[in-house]
Amino acid sequence: MKIVSFQEMANEYELYLEASTRGYHAYFEDATVYIGEILFCELEPDNQHSKYAVVVKNEDDSIVGHVPAELSKIFNKFLSECGKKEAECIGNRFNKGRGNGLELPVDYRLVGNARYLKKLFKELQEKNTESNYNWKLSTVQKCRV
């Protein structure tokens, strides 16, 4: 994990997206997640199911799930180009019965420059509207120091 100086933080902006992490049913016996816990996202280039896979890990570096497929291509590009994304567990695990298995509700936090995040916000907003995913998006704002 990269340590960021206050000066770097002052030039960074953030965007929050409330969605979920999928696949917890495959990992919950080995990885525990608590409400309020900060989770970390990283690229998973060797994933045999998707070349855009983004894995979500807890503070113990244990896998707790993956970014949903409908977000993985966007998040993969973001991580490749900008590099910082984390998630906070905001509720108890659930299964909506749509074949996604156990999911964890999370608030994804994307950090980068304002221009890139505003473009990303627009892209996410359009995708959310077109497909009725019901994601909750914040506006792009300066990082809280």
PLM region descriptions:
Residues 1-145:
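Conserved active-site motif detector
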